[in-house]
Amino acid sequence: MGQSPNGCSINNQQGVEFHQGKILFGDKYLKQSDMFTDAPTKLATPNSLLLCVRAPVGVVNITQREICIGRGLCSLKPNAAINLDYAYHALTTYQSDFESKSTGSTFKAISGSIIRNEVFALPPLQEQYRIVTKIEEIFAQLDAIEASL
């Protein structure tokens, strides 16, 4: 789970890139921020999944670089038995589940225990690669159809 650095350490010139929510989430990969901190508190390493834990709950992205994450994000680092792209696609299917488990009156949020207690299907690594290949093939076809409309 993220932890926001001291507000005095936030700047737009130097330090570790800082993200506190999904505002710079791309379709799949995190976009560059112009906010930095010279006192990072919680780091997400390259090739980690970023999960929004505050409204909107359950949105997923991948960071390709080290960043500092605030309280609105959770970083998940797949191990060697988990294909990053498979984990990304699998986690996106849980958004409505995370939303249904969120609590809060001002804005919805999920806790670390909700994430830790979630059960994910984990096929063998080679099957994960086959699943990702098929998903990307289908998405490419959908993109082509959409472009032709």
Located regions from the model:
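Extended, charge-rich, solvent-exposed interface segments
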Residues: T106
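Flexible loop/turn segments at secondary-structure boundaries
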Residues: Q3, G26-K28, G58-V60, A140
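Amphipathic alpha-helical coiled-coil/heptad-repeat segments
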Residues: D97, I114-L149
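A short beta-sheet element
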Residues: Q20-K22, L30-T92, S102, S111
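Low-complexity, Lys/Gly-biased intrinsically disordered segments
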Residues: M1-G26, A39
